[in-house]
Amino acid sequence: MLQKIILATVVAFVLSLASGPLFIPYLRKLKFGQKVREDGPKSHIKKSGTPTMGGIMFITATVISTLIFSHWNKYLAILLLGFLGYGLIGFADDFLKVYFKRPLGLKAREKLIGQFLLAIIISYFAQEYVGTEVIFPFLKTTIDLGNFYIPFIVFVIVGTVNSVNLTDGLDGLAAGVSFIVMAFFTMTALFLNNITYGAFSAALTGGLLGFLRYNRHPAEIFMGDTGSLAIGGAIATAAVLTKLPLILPLIGIIYVAEAFSVIIQVLSFKLFGKRVFKMSPLHHHFELSGWQEQNVVYAFWIVTLIAMFLSFYSLS
């Protein structure tokens, strides 16, 4: 199994890396460039026009590598449903922005309806395939959620998807953090001796590493919602199928911090007319506090690495 895990990682890495010189110029030719938010940090203005929808690179690499090294079964079908389903929602959002010049892409309501419907489908099949028990980290026990399972899992999936999306705001941030998170799920699958989860997680880990070659600062391409929603779907679905949704606030601590910074900022401004952060999501707050973009990214990577070791400890 270890050999297949390594090969799945390497093949996805090579495919993702090799697609860059072909895909990036093609997106430039199509003028599929990212529009930078006008109220964002001034240092980001120069990024306007950078090719987006780069998630297609590691999505394609991941799917090909997974199908080569994994066995087709109902668990893999659900993993790919979460990965490709949310990637498709992101693709529709990106395509409306860059092709039809619709600045906001899909309407928030349209996006949420799609996200919730997909989450309900995934949670239903997860309940059928793995039951309603989830592992409680640190306590080394399981909790049977019973009738609360589907509502809880829907919340976890939609929350994770949107939290990853919010994290994708600096060069290499979401890709690097998610690389570490997927490495955690790869090693977890290895301990479980499950090639289905292992091959998929390893392939996405390798695909993200290959993509980082072009997404690190200064980024040649952005993953877009195509990539960030797909990653969120993959992480959430992997956590659900391994009975580890409760590990997500720990291994995904950066995602949680980014999401809560937005929630706190909005609530604080609406209730008290004051902003807690200089700008949200959290990574922009650090930028406006004088941090270099690369230093924010490296710090968030390090925090995720620490969270990974704590996550392993919580399950040992």
Swiss-Prot record:
- CDD domains xrefs: GT_MraY (cd06852)
Q: Which domain of life is it from?
A: Bacteria
What InterPro entries does the database record attribute to this sequence? Answer: Glycosyl_transferase_4 (IPR000715), PNAcMuramoyl-5peptid_Trfase (IPR003524), PNAcMuramoyl-5peptid_Trfase_CS (IPR018480)
- What residue intervals traverse the membrane? 5-25, 49-69, 76-96, 116-136, 141-161, 172-192, 195-212, 221-241, 244-264, 296-316
In UniProt terms, what function does this protein have? Catalyzes the initial step of the lipid cycle reactions in the biosynthesis of the cell wall peptidoglycan: transfers peptidoglycan precursor phospho-MurNAc-pentapeptide from UDP-MurNAc-pentapeptide onto the lipid carrier undecaprenyl phosphate, yielding undecaprenyl-pyrophosphoryl-MurNAc-pentapeptide, known as lipid I.
Q: Please give the positions of the paired cysteines in each disulfide bond.
A: none
Q: Give this protein's Gene Ontology molecular function annotations.
A: metal ion binding; phospho-N-acetylmuramoyl-pentapeptide-transferase activity; UDP-N-acetylmuramoyl-L-alanyl-D-glutamyl-meso-2,6-diaminopimelyl-D-alanyl-D-alanine:undecaprenyl-phosphate transferase activity
> What is catalysed by this protein?
UDP-N-acetyl-alpha-D-muramoyl-L-alanyl-gamma-D-glutamyl-meso-2,6-diaminopimeloyl-D-alanyl-D-alanine + di-trans,octa-cis-undecaprenyl phosphate = di-trans,octa-cis-undecaprenyl diphospho-N-acetyl-alpha-D-muramoyl-L-alanyl-D-glutamyl-meso-2,6-diaminopimeloyl-D-alanyl-D-alanine + UMP
Q: Which family does it belong to?
A: Belongs to the glycosyltransferase 4 family. MraY subfamily.
Q: Which co-factor is required?
A: Mg(2+)
Q: Which PANTHER family match?
A: PHOSPHO-N-ACETYLMURAMOYL-PENTAPEPTIDE-TRANSFERASE, PHOSPHO-N-ACETYLMURAMOYL-PENTAPEPTIDE-TRANSFERASE HOMOLOG
GO biological processes: cell division; cell wall organization; peptidoglycan biosynthetic process; regulation of cell shape
**Localization annotation:** Cell membrane
Cite the EC number.
Answer: 2.7.8.13
The protein's annotated pathway: Cell wall biogenesis; peptidoglycan biosynthesis
Tell me how this protein sits in the membrane: Multi-pass membrane protein
A GO CC term assigned to this protein in UniProt:
plasma membrane
The enzyme's first-digit EC class, named in words, is transferase
What keywords are assigned to this protein? Cell cycle, Cell division, Cell membrane, Cell shape, Cell wall biogenesis/degradation, Magnesium, Membrane, Metal-binding, Peptidoglycan synthesis, Transferase, Transmembrane, Transmembrane helix
Originating organism: Thermoanaerobacter pseudethanolicus (strain ATCC 33223 / 39E) (Clostridium thermohydrosulfuricum)
This chain belongs to the protein called Phospho-N-acetylmuramoyl-pentapeptide-transferase
